[in-house]
């Protein structure tokens, strides 16, 4: 299935049915009162997050989604039937944005999350509602309201703890296949990875994290070159980036120059993504003679000007991968605990306790260091 992470759709909720003006006419009630029923409600449209869907391809070809209108009311106090709602299933991680004003309508982050994106119109009132002590035979009725109509832009940002950065053929796909359950296409030519891949890394039965691999970046990516720039949005939700560098490239390519190009493109694309925690992973050590490894690593770090964490691995032989995975999980665990503490911290609101401000000179209060 083709990976699609953007789509534009139009959603049209159903109109409410019209109310009716009707009067009871029976054999022994020739002048019965009003009995016009209400119109049924129009169908609404909901977006539902589904973890079993991983692309927006269905919405690339089905651009319009319209719910049915509610039925009109009838006499004998018969109400019109309400139309069924429509539920559009989308991948977890989908952003739903109003295409006209850019308003973020919903961010689908959990499986089963359901969000109303177009509300159906309310049904109109029948004349039974307009009866009063001064108007015993009302002929008024109201029409159903129109359903909402919206043009939406859907953007998929995969949910992962770790994101992989690197040039084409840096070994990102080999790494993700070595440490997770993902099985991306691996070959010895550039741009083997054509769309993001997600893998679950299991440290133990109860400990795991999700890692995302995107197509490799090249110099000039922020200006449209290559494939990776269009997928960088998938790294915006990650907690940590792994910058994977090929330490033994072919054709005498300078790995320092390539690594600096990645950092440059990252900064040009998004400052927030550039500021995200980033670790340096030097790959393909199996292709470097053992007596040269230490010097090559030291020279690279010096020329690159790197001061952060550094890991030396061979994704092919899995050398160093286990230690890296352990370090990643420990880092992720600390981040998760910090987020949980933030969510649980009670927010103190002075107004809720009847205090607008505190005067240090007020004798009712004592400042404790």
UniProtKB/Swiss-Prot annotation:
Top-tier EC class: hydrolase
Keyword Nucleotidyltransferase: no
Residues covered by region (Disordered): 128-148
Segments forming domain OBG-type G: 160-333
Localisation: Cytoplasm
Gene Ontology molecular-function annotations: GTP binding; GTPase activity; magnesium ion binding
All copies of domain Obg, residue ranges: 1-159
Binding site for Mg(2+): 173, 193
InterPro entries in alphabetical order: G_OBG (IPR031167), GTP-bd (IPR006073), GTP-bd_Obg/CgtA (IPR014100), GTP1-OBG_CS (IPR006074), GTP1_OBG_dom (IPR006169), GTP1_OBG_dom_sf (IPR036726), OBG_GTPase (IPR045086), P-loop_NTPase (IPR027417)
Key words, A-Z: Cytoplasm, GTP-binding, Hydrolase, Magnesium, Metal-binding, Nucleotide-binding
GO biological process assignments: ribosome biogenesis
Cellular component per GO, a single term: cytoplasm
Keyword Metal-binding attached: yes
Enzyme Commission numbers on file: 3.6.5.-
Chain sites annotated for binding GTP: 166-173, 191-195, 213-216, 283-286, 314-316
Cofactor(s) recorded in Swiss-Prot or TrEMBL: Mg(2+)
Family the entry assigns: Belongs to the TRAFAC class OBG-HflX-like GTPase superfamily. OBG GTPase family.
Biological function: An essential GTPase which binds GTP, GDP and possibly (p)ppGpp with moderate affinity, with high nucleotide exchange rates and a fairly low GTP hydrolysis rate. Plays a role in control of the cell cycle, stress response, ribosome biogenesis and in those bacteria that undergo differentiation, in morphogenesis control.
Record NCBIfam families: Obg_CgtA, PRK12296.1, PRK12297.1, PRK12299.1
Subunit annotation: Monomer.
Name used for this protein in its record: GTPase Obg
Biological source species: Janthinobacterium sp. (strain Marseille) (Minibacterium massiliensis)
């Amino acid at each position: 299935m083709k990976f699609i992470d953007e789509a534009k759709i139009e959603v049209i909720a159903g109109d409410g049915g019209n109310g009716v003006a009707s009067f009871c006419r029976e054999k022994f009630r020739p002048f019965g009162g009003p009995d016009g029923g209400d119109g049924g409600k129009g169908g609404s449209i909901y977006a539902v997050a589904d973890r079993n869907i991983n692309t927006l391809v269905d919405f690339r070809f089905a651009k319009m989604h319209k719910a049915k209108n509610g039925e009109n009311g009838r006499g004998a106090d018969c109400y019109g039937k309400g139309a069924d709602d429509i539920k559009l299933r989308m991948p977890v991680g989908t952003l739903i944005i109003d295409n006209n004003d850019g308003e973020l309508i919903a961010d689908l982050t959990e499986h089963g999350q359901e969000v109303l994106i177009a509300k159906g119109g309310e049904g109109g009132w029948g004349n039974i509602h307009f009866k009063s002590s001064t108007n015993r035979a009302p002929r008024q009725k109201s029409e159903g309201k129109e359903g909402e109509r919206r043009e939406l832009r859907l953007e998929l940002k995969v949910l992962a703890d770790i994101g992989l950065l690197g040039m084409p053929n840096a070994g990102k796909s080999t790494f993700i296949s070595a440490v997770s359950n993902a099985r991306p296409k691996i070959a010895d030519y550039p741009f083997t990875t054509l769309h993001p891949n997600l893998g679950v890394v299991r440290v133990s039965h109860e400990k795991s994290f999700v890692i995302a691999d995107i197509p490799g970046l090249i110099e000039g990516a922020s200006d449209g070159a290559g494939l990776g720039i269009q997928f960088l949005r998938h790294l915006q939700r990650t907690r940590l980036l792994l910058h994977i560098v090929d330490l033994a490239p072919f054709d005498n390519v300078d790995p320092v120059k390539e690594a600096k190009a990645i950092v440059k493109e990252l900064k040009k694309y998004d400052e927030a993504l550039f500021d995200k925690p980033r670790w340096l992973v030097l790959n393909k050590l199996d292709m470097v003679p053992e007596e040269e490894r230490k010097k090559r690593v030291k020279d690279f770090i010096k020329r690159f000007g790197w001061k952060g964490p550094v890991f030396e691995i061979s994704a092919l032989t899995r050398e160093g991968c286990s230690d890296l995975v352990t370090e990643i999980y420990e880092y992720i665990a600390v981040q998760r605990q910090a987020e949980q503490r933030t969510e649980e911290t009670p927010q103190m609101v002075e107004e809720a306790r009847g205090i607008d401000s505190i005067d240090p000179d007020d004798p009712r209060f004592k400042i404790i260091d």
